[in-house]
Amino acid sequence: MLRRKRERRNAVKENEMVIDTPLEKRRTPGKPRATREPPISVVITGHSKGSEDDLISFVWRKVKVRLMNISYSPASVTAVVKSQDFSRLNGLNGAAFAGDHLAIRRVDGASNVTQDYRKAKTKRSFRSVSAPSLSALATQAQRNVSKTLPQSTNETIEKLRQFLQTRYQPATKFLDLGNLQQDPLLKQMGILAEASTKSKMFPALMKVASLNFPDVISVSLSDNNLQSVTAVTTLAQTWPKLLNLSLANNRITSLSDLDPWSPKTKLPELQELVLVGNPIVTTFANRAMDYQREMVSRFPKLRLLDGNSINSEIIASQSTVPFPVYQSFFDKVETEQIVNSFLAAFFKGWDENRSALVNQLYSPNATFSISLNASNVRTNFSQKTDTKKWGAYKMKSRNLLYSQSQKESKSRLFNGHEEISNAVKSLPATAHDLSDRSQWVFDGWNLVLPSVGAAIKIVVHGQFEEPQNKRLLRSFDRTLLILPGGSTGILIINDLLVIRSFAGSLGWLPGQSSVRTSNNAMSASASKPSDIVQPRPEQAMLDTRQQIVLKIKAETGLNDYYAHMCCEQNNWDYNSALASFLELKSRNVIPAEAFS
Protein backbone atom coordinates (compact mmCIF):
# COMPACT_ATOMS: atom_id res chain seq x y z
CA MET A 1 0.00 0.00 0.00
CA LEU A 2 2.76 2.47 0.96
CA ARG A 3 4.70 1.59 -2.20
CA ARG A 4 1.70 2.45 -4.41
CA LYS A 5 1.27 5.85 -2.68
CA ARG A 6 4.94 6.70 -3.29
CA GLU A 7 4.62 5.86 -7.00
CA ARG A 8 1.52 8.09 -7.36
CA ARG A 9 3.29 11.04 -5.65
CA ASN A 10 6.32 10.67 -7.95
CA ALA A 11 4.11 10.58 -11.05
CA VAL A 12 2.36 13.82 -9.99
CA LYS A 13 5.73 15.56 -9.52
CA GLU A 14 6.94 14.46 -12.94
CA ASN A 15 3.78 15.79 -14.61
CA GLU A 16 4.21 19.14 -12.86
CA MET A 17 7.81 19.33 -14.10
CA VAL A 18 6.75 18.61 -17.66
CA ILE A 19 4.16 21.38 -17.58
CA ASP A 20 6.35 24.01 -15.89
CA THR A 21 9.68 23.26 -17.54
CA PRO A 22 10.45 25.22 -20.76
CA LEU A 23 10.67 23.22 -23.98
CA GLU A 24 14.41 23.69 -24.43
CA LYS A 25 15.10 22.36 -20.88
CA ARG A 26 12.88 19.35 -21.35
CA ARG A 27 14.93 18.03 -24.28
CA THR A 28 17.35 15.38 -23.26
CA PRO A 29 20.95 16.08 -24.23
CA GLY A 30 22.20 14.13 -27.23
CA LYS A 31 23.81 14.45 -30.61
CA PRO A 32 23.05 17.69 -32.44
CA ARG A 33 20.53 17.33 -35.22
CA ALA A 34 21.98 17.08 -38.71
CA THR A 35 21.23 20.14 -40.80
CA ARG A 36 20.80 20.01 -44.52
CA GLU A 37 23.38 21.87 -46.51
CA PRO A 38 22.00 24.42 -48.96
CA PRO A 39 22.07 23.50 -52.65
CA ILE A 40 25.04 24.50 -54.79
CA SER A 41 24.91 26.59 -57.94
CA VAL A 42 27.07 25.42 -60.84
CA VAL A 43 27.96 26.67 -64.31
CA ILE A 44 28.55 24.14 -67.09
CA THR A 45 30.21 24.88 -70.42
CA GLY A 46 31.34 22.69 -73.32
CA HIS A 47 27.75 21.60 -73.92
CA SER A 48 26.83 23.64 -76.98
CA LYS A 49 26.72 20.68 -79.39
CA GLY A 50 24.01 18.95 -77.38
CA SER A 51 20.52 19.93 -76.30
CA GLU A 52 19.31 20.62 -72.77
CA ASP A 53 17.59 17.23 -72.63
CA ASP A 54 20.77 15.53 -73.86
CA LEU A 55 22.80 17.16 -71.09
CA ILE A 56 20.30 16.28 -68.35
CA SER A 57 20.15 12.67 -69.52
CA PHE A 58 23.95 12.44 -69.82
CA VAL A 59 24.56 13.70 -66.26
CA TRP A 60 21.93 11.39 -64.79
CA ARG A 61 23.21 8.39 -66.72
CA LYS A 62 26.83 8.95 -65.74
CA VAL A 63 26.70 10.08 -62.09
CA LYS A 64 23.00 9.89 -61.08
CA VAL A 65 22.80 13.63 -60.31
CA ARG A 66 19.71 15.70 -61.07
CA LEU A 67 20.22 19.19 -62.49
CA MET A 68 17.55 21.56 -61.16
CA ASN A 69 16.42 25.09 -62.00
CA ILE A 70 18.31 24.95 -65.28
CA SER A 71 18.94 28.05 -67.35
CA TYR A 72 20.19 26.88 -70.74
CA SER A 73 21.98 28.92 -73.40
CA PRO A 74 24.57 28.04 -76.06
CA ALA A 75 27.25 29.85 -74.05
CA SER A 76 26.67 28.24 -70.65
CA VAL A 77 24.26 26.32 -68.47
CA THR A 78 23.51 27.38 -64.91
CA ALA A 79 21.89 24.87 -62.59
CA VAL A 80 21.48 23.86 -58.98
CA VAL A 81 22.44 20.51 -57.44
CA LYS A 82 22.17 19.04 -53.98
CA SER A 83 25.21 19.71 -51.82
CA GLN A 84 25.96 16.00 -51.41
CA ASP A 85 25.80 15.51 -55.20
CA PHE A 86 28.32 18.18 -56.18
CA SER A 87 31.41 15.99 -55.78
CA ARG A 88 29.93 13.40 -58.16
CA LEU A 89 28.95 16.04 -60.67
CA ASN A 90 32.42 17.58 -60.47
CA GLY A 91 33.80 14.20 -61.52
CA LEU A 92 32.44 14.92 -65.01
CA ASN A 93 34.91 17.78 -65.49
CA GLY A 94 36.59 17.11 -68.82
CA ALA A 95 34.14 14.34 -69.75
CA ALA A 96 33.46 13.95 -73.47
CA PHE A 97 29.96 15.12 -74.39
CA ALA A 98 28.48 15.54 -77.89
CA GLY A 99 31.85 16.04 -79.53
CA ASP A 100 33.14 18.44 -76.86
CA HIS A 101 34.34 18.30 -73.24
CA LEU A 102 32.36 19.53 -70.27
CA ALA A 103 33.76 22.14 -67.87
CA ILE A 104 32.01 22.43 -64.50
CA ARG A 105 32.63 25.08 -61.85
CA ARG A 106 30.97 25.99 -58.62
CA VAL A 107 29.56 29.51 -58.44
CA ASP A 108 30.78 31.52 -55.47
CA GLY A 109 28.02 33.38 -53.69
CA ALA A 110 24.43 32.38 -53.19
CA SER A 111 22.18 31.81 -56.14
CA ASN A 112 18.52 32.83 -56.14
CA VAL A 113 17.55 29.33 -55.09
CA THR A 114 20.18 29.27 -52.34
CA GLN A 115 18.88 32.61 -51.06
CA ASP A 116 15.33 31.25 -51.06
CA TYR A 117 16.60 28.33 -49.04
CA ARG A 118 18.27 30.55 -46.44
CA LYS A 119 15.26 32.83 -46.14
CA ALA A 120 13.05 29.85 -45.53
CA LYS A 121 15.50 28.56 -42.96
CA THR A 122 15.48 31.80 -40.92
CA LYS A 123 11.68 31.87 -40.89
CA ARG A 124 11.39 28.41 -39.38
CA SER A 125 9.45 28.18 -36.15
CA PHE A 126 10.85 26.20 -33.23
CA ARG A 127 8.50 23.38 -34.22
CA SER A 128 10.05 22.98 -37.73
CA VAL A 129 12.67 20.29 -37.85
CA SER A 130 13.54 20.02 -41.56
CA ALA A 131 14.59 22.36 -44.36
CA PRO A 132 12.26 22.97 -47.28
CA SER A 133 12.72 20.35 -49.97
CA LEU A 134 14.85 21.12 -52.99
CA SER A 135 11.91 20.40 -55.27
CA ALA A 136 9.88 23.03 -53.43
CA LEU A 137 12.70 25.55 -53.82
CA ALA A 138 13.02 24.75 -57.50
CA THR A 139 9.26 25.22 -57.90
CA GLN A 140 9.48 28.58 -56.14
CA ALA A 141 12.34 29.63 -58.37
CA GLN A 142 10.30 28.65 -61.40
CA ARG A 143 7.48 30.83 -60.10
CA ASN A 144 9.91 33.73 -59.83
CA VAL A 145 10.81 33.26 -63.48
CA SER A 146 7.18 32.98 -64.52
CA LYS A 147 6.50 36.35 -62.85
CA THR A 148 8.45 38.00 -65.64
CA LEU A 149 5.68 37.00 -68.05
CA PRO A 150 2.62 39.20 -68.18
CA GLN A 151 0.27 36.24 -68.53
CA SER A 152 -0.54 33.20 -66.45
CA THR A 153 0.72 29.83 -67.63
CA ASN A 154 -2.61 28.82 -69.17
CA GLU A 155 -2.95 32.17 -70.90
CA THR A 156 0.60 31.91 -72.24
CA ILE A 157 -0.07 28.43 -73.65
CA GLU A 158 -3.27 29.65 -75.29
CA LYS A 159 -1.50 32.60 -76.91
CA LEU A 160 1.29 30.35 -78.16
CA ARG A 161 -1.36 28.11 -79.70
CA GLN A 162 -2.97 31.14 -81.35
CA PHE A 163 0.42 32.23 -82.68
CA LEU A 164 1.06 28.78 -84.17
CA GLN A 165 -2.43 28.77 -85.69
CA THR A 166 -1.63 31.95 -87.61
CA ARG A 167 1.61 30.43 -88.90
CA TYR A 168 0.33 26.98 -89.91
CA GLN A 169 -0.87 26.01 -93.39
CA PRO A 170 -2.88 22.78 -93.00
CA ALA A 171 -3.16 22.11 -96.74
CA THR A 172 0.61 21.72 -97.09
CA LYS A 173 1.33 20.86 -93.44
CA PHE A 174 3.78 23.76 -93.41
CA LEU A 175 4.67 25.71 -90.25
CA ASP A 176 6.35 29.09 -90.69
CA LEU A 177 8.52 29.91 -87.67
CA GLY A 178 10.54 32.54 -89.50
CA ASN A 179 11.49 35.95 -88.08
CA LEU A 180 10.04 35.28 -84.62
CA GLN A 181 11.56 38.43 -83.13
CA GLN A 182 9.31 40.64 -85.24
CA ASP A 183 6.05 38.80 -84.67
CA PRO A 184 3.48 41.23 -83.14
CA LEU A 185 1.84 38.63 -80.91
CA LEU A 186 5.13 37.40 -79.43
CA LYS A 187 6.20 41.01 -78.90
CA GLN A 188 2.96 41.73 -77.08
CA MET A 189 3.49 38.70 -74.85
CA GLY A 190 6.99 39.89 -73.95
CA ILE A 191 8.23 36.33 -74.13
CA LEU A 192 11.30 37.31 -76.15
CA ALA A 193 12.15 40.40 -74.13
CA GLU A 194 14.48 38.76 -71.59
CA ALA A 195 17.13 36.08 -71.98
CA SER A 196 15.66 34.00 -69.13
CA THR A 197 12.33 33.58 -70.91
CA LYS A 198 13.71 33.65 -74.45
CA SER A 199 15.82 30.51 -73.89
CA LYS A 200 12.74 28.60 -72.74
CA MET A 201 10.40 29.93 -75.39
CA PHE A 202 11.24 27.55 -78.23
CA PRO A 203 11.00 24.30 -76.19
CA ALA A 204 7.64 25.55 -74.86
CA LEU A 205 6.56 26.41 -78.39
CA MET A 206 7.50 22.91 -79.56
CA LYS A 207 5.52 21.36 -76.73
CA VAL A 208 2.40 23.28 -77.69
CA ALA A 209 2.99 22.54 -81.38
CA SER A 210 3.38 18.80 -80.81
CA LEU A 211 0.00 18.69 -79.09
CA ASN A 212 -1.86 20.76 -81.69
CA PHE A 213 -0.01 20.14 -84.98
CA PRO A 214 1.50 16.65 -84.89
CA ASP A 215 1.42 16.18 -88.69
CA VAL A 216 3.82 18.97 -89.70
CA ILE A 217 6.18 17.92 -92.52
CA SER A 218 7.69 21.30 -93.51
CA VAL A 219 9.13 24.02 -91.25
CA SER A 220 10.80 27.36 -91.89
CA LEU A 221 13.20 28.82 -89.30
CA SER A 222 14.48 31.57 -91.58
CA ASP A 223 15.57 35.03 -90.40
CA ASN A 224 15.96 34.09 -86.72
CA ASN A 225 19.59 35.16 -86.28
CA LEU A 226 20.53 31.56 -85.40
CA GLN A 227 24.25 30.96 -84.93
CA SER A 228 23.67 27.22 -84.51
CA VAL A 229 20.73 24.85 -84.18
CA THR A 230 21.37 24.31 -80.46
CA ALA A 231 18.61 26.71 -79.45
CA VAL A 232 16.09 24.96 -81.71
CA THR A 233 17.28 21.37 -81.34
CA THR A 234 13.92 20.30 -79.88
CA LEU A 235 12.46 20.67 -83.38
CA ALA A 236 13.97 17.28 -84.27
CA GLN A 237 12.38 15.67 -81.23
CA THR A 238 8.99 17.21 -81.99
CA TRP A 239 8.83 16.12 -85.64
CA PRO A 240 11.41 13.38 -86.23
CA LYS A 241 9.82 12.59 -89.62
CA LEU A 242 10.16 16.14 -90.93
CA LEU A 243 10.65 16.23 -94.72
CA ASN A 244 11.48 19.87 -95.52
CA LEU A 245 13.39 22.47 -93.49
CA SER A 246 14.50 26.04 -94.19
CA LEU A 247 17.27 27.70 -92.18
CA ALA A 248 17.70 30.52 -94.69
CA ASN A 249 19.13 33.91 -93.73
CA ASN A 250 20.62 32.94 -90.38
CA ARG A 251 24.22 33.06 -89.11
CA ILE A 252 25.25 29.41 -89.44
CA THR A 253 28.95 29.50 -90.22
CA SER A 254 30.36 25.98 -89.99
CA LEU A 255 29.34 22.35 -90.09
CA SER A 256 29.71 22.13 -86.31
CA ASP A 257 26.77 24.52 -85.99
CA LEU A 258 24.60 21.70 -87.34
CA ASP A 259 26.10 19.01 -85.09
CA PRO A 260 23.16 18.82 -82.64
CA TRP A 261 21.15 17.48 -85.59
CA SER A 262 24.01 15.54 -87.13
CA PRO A 263 23.28 12.07 -85.70
CA LYS A 264 21.39 10.25 -88.42
CA THR A 265 18.62 9.43 -85.95
CA LYS A 266 17.67 13.09 -85.37
CA LEU A 267 16.08 13.95 -88.75
CA PRO A 268 16.31 10.66 -90.63
CA GLU A 269 13.57 11.47 -93.18
CA LEU A 270 14.67 15.00 -94.14
CA GLN A 271 14.56 15.40 -97.94
CA GLU A 272 15.02 19.14 -98.50
CA LEU A 273 17.24 21.64 -96.66
CA VAL A 274 17.66 25.36 -97.39
CA LEU A 275 20.73 27.19 -96.04
CA VAL A 276 20.79 30.12 -98.47
CA GLY A 277 21.85 33.35 -96.78
CA ASN A 278 24.13 31.66 -94.21
CA PRO A 279 27.93 32.15 -94.12
CA ILE A 280 28.40 28.39 -94.51
CA VAL A 281 27.18 28.64 -98.12
CA THR A 282 30.00 31.07 -98.87
CA THR A 283 32.49 28.72 -97.22
CA PHE A 284 31.57 25.99 -99.72
CA ALA A 285 31.07 28.36 -102.66
CA ASN A 286 33.62 26.60 -104.89
CA ARG A 287 33.11 23.11 -103.46
CA ALA A 288 29.57 22.17 -104.39
CA MET A 289 30.21 18.41 -104.27
CA ASP A 290 31.84 18.63 -100.83
CA TYR A 291 28.94 20.78 -99.62
CA GLN A 292 26.39 18.23 -100.76
CA ARG A 293 28.43 15.31 -99.46
CA GLU A 294 28.70 16.83 -95.98
CA MET A 295 24.97 17.49 -95.79
CA VAL A 296 24.00 14.05 -97.04
CA SER A 297 26.30 12.48 -94.45
CA ARG A 298 24.21 14.24 -91.79
CA PHE A 299 20.81 13.76 -93.41
CA PRO A 300 20.95 10.49 -95.40
CA LYS A 301 17.67 10.97 -97.31
CA LEU A 302 18.43 14.53 -98.41
CA ARG A 303 17.58 15.05 -102.09
CA LEU A 304 17.40 18.86 -102.43
CA LEU A 305 19.92 21.32 -101.00
CA ASP A 306 19.30 25.05 -101.54
CA GLY A 307 16.97 24.13 -104.40
CA ASN A 308 19.55 21.98 -106.20
CA SER A 309 19.26 18.22 -106.63
CA ILE A 310 21.82 16.10 -104.81
CA ASN A 311 24.35 14.53 -107.17
CA SER A 312 23.36 10.94 -108.01
CA GLU A 313 26.87 9.65 -107.26
CA ILE A 314 26.67 11.06 -103.73
CA ILE A 315 23.28 9.42 -103.18
CA ALA A 316 24.62 6.11 -104.47
CA SER A 317 27.67 6.30 -102.21
CA GLN A 318 25.39 6.67 -99.17
CA SER A 319 23.36 3.59 -100.00
CA THR A 320 26.10 1.18 -101.04
CA VAL A 321 28.69 -0.83 -99.19
CA PRO A 322 32.39 -1.09 -100.10
CA PHE A 323 31.79 -4.49 -101.70
CA PRO A 324 28.96 -5.42 -104.07
CA VAL A 325 25.92 -7.24 -102.72
CA TYR A 326 25.95 -10.88 -103.77
CA GLN A 327 23.17 -13.38 -103.73
CA SER A 328 23.86 -17.10 -103.83
CA PHE A 329 27.44 -18.30 -104.25
CA PHE A 330 28.65 -21.72 -105.43
CA ASP A 331 32.21 -22.67 -106.26
CA LYS A 332 31.07 -25.05 -109.01
CA VAL A 333 27.99 -25.75 -111.08
CA GLU A 334 28.01 -29.31 -109.71
CA THR A 335 27.97 -27.94 -106.15
CA GLU A 336 24.96 -25.79 -106.99
CA GLN A 337 23.07 -28.80 -108.34
CA ILE A 338 23.81 -30.88 -105.24
CA VAL A 339 22.91 -28.09 -102.80
CA ASN A 340 19.66 -27.12 -104.54
CA SER A 341 18.49 -30.73 -104.63
CA PHE A 342 19.52 -31.43 -101.05
CA LEU A 343 17.91 -28.30 -99.54
CA ALA A 344 14.60 -28.92 -101.31
CA ALA A 345 14.39 -32.38 -99.75
CA PHE A 346 15.75 -31.19 -96.40
CA PHE A 347 13.21 -28.41 -95.79
CA LYS A 348 10.34 -30.57 -97.02
CA GLY A 349 11.29 -33.22 -94.47
CA TRP A 350 11.82 -30.61 -91.72
CA ASP A 351 8.29 -29.28 -92.22
CA GLU A 352 6.55 -32.65 -92.54
CA ASN A 353 8.37 -35.33 -90.51
CA ARG A 354 11.45 -34.31 -88.54
CA SER A 355 12.06 -37.67 -86.90
CA ALA A 356 12.21 -39.42 -90.27
CA LEU A 357 14.43 -36.64 -91.60
CA VAL A 358 16.93 -37.08 -88.77
CA ASN A 359 17.10 -40.85 -89.23
CA GLN A 360 17.49 -40.52 -92.99
CA LEU A 361 19.82 -37.53 -93.48
CA TYR A 362 21.79 -37.07 -90.24
CA SER A 363 24.95 -39.02 -89.50
CA PRO A 364 24.85 -41.19 -86.34
CA ASN A 365 27.62 -38.91 -85.03
CA ALA A 366 25.99 -35.64 -86.14
CA THR A 367 25.67 -32.58 -83.88
CA PHE A 368 22.80 -30.08 -83.83
CA SER A 369 22.46 -26.78 -81.95
CA ILE A 370 20.23 -23.70 -81.85
CA SER A 371 21.11 -20.08 -81.13
CA LEU A 372 18.39 -17.50 -80.55
CA ASN A 373 19.16 -13.92 -81.58
CA ALA A 374 16.16 -12.07 -80.15
CA SER A 375 17.94 -8.70 -80.19
CA ASN A 376 18.70 -8.38 -83.89
CA VAL A 377 17.92 -5.05 -85.52
CA ARG A 378 14.18 -4.95 -86.09
CA THR A 379 12.78 -3.59 -89.34
CA ASN A 380 9.41 -2.46 -90.64
CA PHE A 381 8.80 -6.11 -91.52
CA SER A 382 9.14 -7.27 -87.91
CA GLN A 383 5.92 -8.25 -86.21
CA LYS A 384 5.01 -6.82 -82.82
CA THR A 385 4.23 -10.25 -81.38
CA ASP A 386 7.30 -12.14 -82.52
CA THR A 387 9.28 -11.53 -79.32
CA LYS A 388 6.47 -12.97 -77.18
CA LYS A 389 6.79 -16.50 -78.56
CA TRP A 390 10.49 -17.30 -78.14
CA GLY A 391 9.96 -19.76 -75.28
CA ALA A 392 10.55 -23.00 -77.20
CA TYR A 393 13.75 -21.63 -78.71
CA LYS A 394 15.07 -20.17 -75.45
CA MET A 395 14.88 -23.60 -73.81
CA LYS A 396 17.20 -25.01 -76.48
CA SER A 397 19.38 -21.99 -77.26
CA ARG A 398 23.13 -22.11 -76.56
CA ASN A 399 23.29 -18.31 -76.71
CA LEU A 400 25.02 -17.12 -73.53
CA LEU A 401 22.02 -14.91 -72.75
CA TYR A 402 19.85 -17.99 -72.26
CA SER A 403 22.39 -20.50 -70.99
CA GLN A 404 23.24 -20.00 -67.34
CA SER A 405 26.27 -22.28 -67.02
CA GLN A 406 28.82 -24.20 -69.04
CA LYS A 407 27.12 -27.44 -68.06
CA GLU A 408 23.76 -26.19 -69.32
CA SER A 409 25.32 -24.94 -72.55
CA LYS A 410 26.98 -28.30 -73.11
CA SER A 411 23.71 -30.13 -72.54
CA ARG A 412 22.16 -28.12 -75.37
CA LEU A 413 24.61 -29.47 -77.94
CA PHE A 414 22.67 -32.46 -79.26
CA ASN A 415 24.56 -35.50 -80.56
CA GLY A 416 23.28 -38.54 -82.44
CA HIS A 417 19.89 -39.50 -83.79
CA GLU A 418 18.02 -39.80 -80.50
CA GLU A 419 19.09 -36.48 -78.95
CA ILE A 420 18.66 -34.55 -82.19
CA SER A 421 15.26 -36.11 -82.88
CA ASN A 422 13.97 -35.23 -79.40
CA ALA A 423 15.28 -31.67 -79.72
CA VAL A 424 13.81 -30.89 -83.14
CA LYS A 425 10.42 -32.42 -82.32
CA SER A 426 10.04 -29.97 -79.41
CA LEU A 427 10.36 -26.94 -81.71
CA PRO A 428 7.28 -25.24 -83.22
CA ALA A 429 5.94 -26.54 -86.52
CA THR A 430 7.24 -24.66 -89.55
CA ALA A 431 6.50 -24.04 -93.23
CA HIS A 432 9.36 -23.11 -95.58
CA ASP A 433 8.12 -21.69 -98.90
CA LEU A 434 10.90 -22.22 -101.45
CA SER A 435 8.90 -21.10 -104.49
CA ASP A 436 10.14 -17.49 -104.35
CA ARG A 437 13.91 -17.68 -104.68
CA SER A 438 14.29 -13.93 -104.00
CA GLN A 439 13.49 -14.68 -100.35
CA TRP A 440 16.48 -16.99 -100.01
CA VAL A 441 20.26 -17.05 -100.22
CA PHE A 442 22.13 -20.35 -100.60
CA ASP A 443 25.92 -20.56 -100.46
CA GLY A 444 27.82 -23.78 -101.01
CA TRP A 445 31.44 -24.74 -101.53
CA ASN A 446 33.70 -27.76 -101.29
CA LEU A 447 36.32 -28.21 -98.62
CA VAL A 448 38.49 -30.95 -97.18
CA LEU A 449 38.42 -31.65 -93.43
CA PRO A 450 41.25 -33.62 -91.79
CA SER A 451 38.86 -35.78 -89.79
CA VAL A 452 36.26 -36.63 -92.44
CA GLY A 453 37.77 -35.78 -95.82
CA ALA A 454 35.81 -34.13 -98.66
CA ALA A 455 32.71 -32.19 -97.58
CA ILE A 456 30.39 -29.39 -98.68
CA LYS A 457 29.60 -26.44 -96.44
CA ILE A 458 26.15 -24.91 -96.94
CA VAL A 459 24.98 -21.56 -95.55
CA VAL A 460 21.29 -20.66 -95.85
CA HIS A 461 19.58 -17.32 -95.14
CA GLY A 462 15.82 -17.27 -95.36
CA GLN A 463 12.48 -17.27 -93.59
CA PHE A 464 9.73 -19.60 -92.41
CA GLU A 465 6.23 -19.45 -90.99
CA GLU A 466 4.90 -20.94 -87.77
CA PRO A 467 1.38 -22.04 -88.81
CA GLN A 468 0.27 -22.69 -85.23
CA ASN A 469 1.23 -19.13 -84.16
CA LYS A 470 -1.08 -17.23 -86.53
CA ARG A 471 1.40 -17.72 -89.36
CA LEU A 472 4.10 -15.83 -87.52
CA LEU A 473 7.16 -15.15 -89.69
CA ARG A 474 10.76 -15.73 -88.56
CA SER A 475 14.09 -15.10 -90.24
CA PHE A 476 16.86 -17.64 -89.83
CA ASP A 477 20.42 -18.53 -90.78
CA ARG A 478 21.48 -22.16 -91.04
CA THR A 479 24.91 -23.69 -91.52
CA LEU A 480 25.10 -27.33 -92.60
CA LEU A 481 28.12 -29.53 -93.20
CA ILE A 482 27.37 -32.51 -95.47
CA LEU A 483 29.36 -35.57 -96.55
CA PRO A 484 28.77 -38.24 -99.18
CA GLY A 485 27.16 -41.35 -97.70
CA GLY A 486 23.97 -42.89 -96.38
CA SER A 487 20.96 -44.19 -98.27
CA THR A 488 20.37 -40.83 -99.97
CA GLY A 489 24.01 -40.25 -100.85
CA ILE A 490 24.30 -37.33 -98.39
CA LEU A 491 24.78 -37.24 -94.61
CA ILE A 492 24.68 -34.18 -92.33
CA ILE A 493 27.45 -34.12 -89.74
CA ASN A 494 26.85 -30.63 -88.34
CA ASP A 495 23.76 -28.40 -88.22
CA LEU A 496 23.69 -24.94 -86.62
CA LEU A 497 20.36 -23.06 -86.64
CA VAL A 498 20.15 -19.34 -85.74
CA ILE A 499 16.63 -17.91 -85.25
CA ARG A 500 15.94 -14.16 -85.59
CA SER A 501 13.03 -11.71 -85.71
CA PHE A 502 11.67 -11.45 -89.22
CA ALA A 503 13.68 -8.90 -91.21
CA GLY A 504 12.67 -9.52 -94.82
CA SER A 505 15.05 -10.12 -97.71
CA LEU A 506 16.10 -6.59 -98.67
CA GLY A 507 19.55 -7.24 -97.23
CA TRP A 508 20.57 -9.38 -100.18
CA LEU A 509 18.72 -7.78 -103.08
CA PRO A 510 21.22 -7.41 -105.94
CA GLY A 511 22.77 -4.05 -106.72
CA GLN A 512 24.35 -2.88 -109.95
CA SER A 513 27.57 -4.69 -109.12
CA SER A 514 26.06 -7.86 -107.78
CA VAL A 515 26.74 -11.18 -109.41
CA ARG A 516 24.26 -13.48 -111.05
CA THR A 517 21.91 -15.66 -109.08
CA SER A 518 20.37 -18.95 -109.88
CA ASN A 519 16.63 -18.61 -110.33
CA ASN A 520 16.06 -22.31 -110.75
CA ALA A 521 12.90 -23.53 -109.11
CA MET A 522 13.66 -25.68 -106.12
CA SER A 523 12.61 -29.26 -106.63
CA ALA A 524 13.33 -32.61 -105.12
CA SER A 525 15.38 -33.62 -108.13
CA ALA A 526 18.63 -32.06 -109.30
CA SER A 527 18.53 -29.41 -112.01
CA LYS A 528 19.73 -30.30 -115.45
CA PRO A 529 23.00 -28.73 -116.65
CA SER A 530 21.11 -26.98 -119.45
CA ASP A 531 18.92 -25.22 -116.86
CA ILE A 532 21.86 -23.59 -115.09
CA VAL A 533 22.15 -19.87 -115.78
CA GLN A 534 25.53 -19.14 -117.30
CA PRO A 535 27.80 -16.56 -115.60
CA ARG A 536 27.48 -13.01 -116.84
CA PRO A 537 30.56 -11.18 -118.21
CA GLU A 538 30.92 -9.05 -115.08
CA GLN A 539 30.94 -12.19 -112.95
CA ALA A 540 33.79 -13.65 -115.01
CA MET A 541 35.72 -10.39 -114.66
CA LEU A 542 35.25 -10.36 -110.89
CA ASP A 543 36.39 -13.97 -110.63
CA THR A 544 39.52 -13.27 -112.72
CA ARG A 545 40.47 -10.25 -110.64
CA GLN A 546 39.90 -12.16 -107.42
CA GLN A 547 42.25 -14.88 -108.63
CA ILE A 548 44.93 -12.29 -109.44
CA VAL A 549 44.60 -10.77 -105.96
CA LEU A 550 44.89 -14.20 -104.34
CA LYS A 551 48.02 -15.00 -106.37
CA ILE A 552 49.63 -11.68 -105.43
CA LYS A 553 48.79 -12.27 -101.76
CA ALA A 554 50.34 -15.73 -101.85
CA GLU A 555 53.45 -14.52 -103.67
CA THR A 556 54.10 -11.31 -101.70
CA GLY A 557 52.49 -11.75 -98.29
CA LEU A 558 50.49 -8.53 -98.70
CA ASN A 559 47.15 -8.26 -96.89
CA ASP A 560 43.84 -8.01 -98.76
CA TYR A 561 43.75 -4.23 -98.97
CA TYR A 562 47.29 -3.71 -100.25
CA ALA A 563 47.15 -6.71 -102.59
CA HIS A 564 43.97 -5.34 -104.16
CA MET A 565 45.51 -1.86 -104.43
CA CYS A 566 48.67 -3.27 -106.03
CA CYS A 567 46.65 -5.13 -108.68
CA GLU A 568 44.33 -2.20 -109.34
CA GLN A 569 47.21 0.25 -109.85
CA ASN A 570 48.76 -2.13 -112.36
CA ASN A 571 45.57 -2.58 -114.41
CA TRP A 572 45.02 -6.10 -113.10
CA ASP A 573 48.11 -7.45 -114.82
CA TYR A 574 49.72 -10.09 -112.61
CA ASN A 575 53.26 -9.70 -113.97
CA SER A 576 53.18 -5.91 -113.72
CA ALA A 577 51.79 -6.04 -110.19
CA LEU A 578 54.48 -8.47 -109.05
CA ALA A 579 57.25 -6.43 -110.69
CA SER A 580 55.94 -3.26 -109.07
CA PHE A 581 55.90 -4.96 -105.67
CA LEU A 582 59.49 -6.19 -106.01
CA GLU A 583 60.68 -2.73 -107.04
CA LEU A 584 58.99 -1.00 -104.11
CA LYS A 585 60.22 -3.66 -101.71
CA SER A 586 63.82 -3.16 -102.88
CA ARG A 587 63.45 0.55 -102.14
CA ASN A 588 62.07 -0.30 -98.68
CA VAL A 589 59.03 1.97 -99.08
CA ILE A 590 56.26 -0.53 -98.36
CA PRO A 591 54.79 0.15 -94.88
CA ALA A 592 54.74 -2.59 -92.27
CA GLU A 593 50.94 -2.54 -92.05
CA ALA A 594 50.77 -3.78 -95.65
CA PHE A 595 51.76 -7.23 -94.39
CA SER A 596 49.54 -7.40 -91.29
UniProtKB/Swiss-Prot annotation:
Keywords (A to Z) from UniProt: Cytoplasm, Leucine-rich repeat, mRNA transport, Nucleus, Phosphoprotein, Repeat, Transport
This protein's record includes keyword Disulfide bond: no
Gene Ontology terms for molecular function: RNA binding
Subunit and interaction comment: Interacts with mlo3 and rae1.
GO BP field: poly(A)+ mRNA export from nucleus; ribosomal large subunit export from nucleus; tRNA export from nucleus
UniProt modified residues of type Phosphoserine: 128, 130, 133
Protein name per its UniProtKB record: mRNA export factor mex67
Family note: Belongs to the NXF family.
UniProt function note: Involved in the export of mRNA from the nucleus to the cytoplasm.
Disulfide bonds: none
Organism: Schizosaccharomyces pombe (strain 972 / ATCC 24843) (Fission yeast)
Subcellular location(s) per record: Nucleus; Cytoplasm
Domain NTF2, chain residue ranges per copy: 338-499
Keyword Nucleus: yes
Highest classification ranks of the organism: Eukaryota, Fungi, Dikarya, Ascomycota, Taphrinomycotina
Gene Ontology CC: cytosol; nuclear pore; nuclear RNA export factor complex; nucleolar peripheral inclusion body; nucleolus; nucleus
LRR repeat residue intervals: 215-236, 241-262, 263-282
Domain TAP-C positions: 543-596
Domain LRRCT per the UniProt entry, residue ranges: 283-338
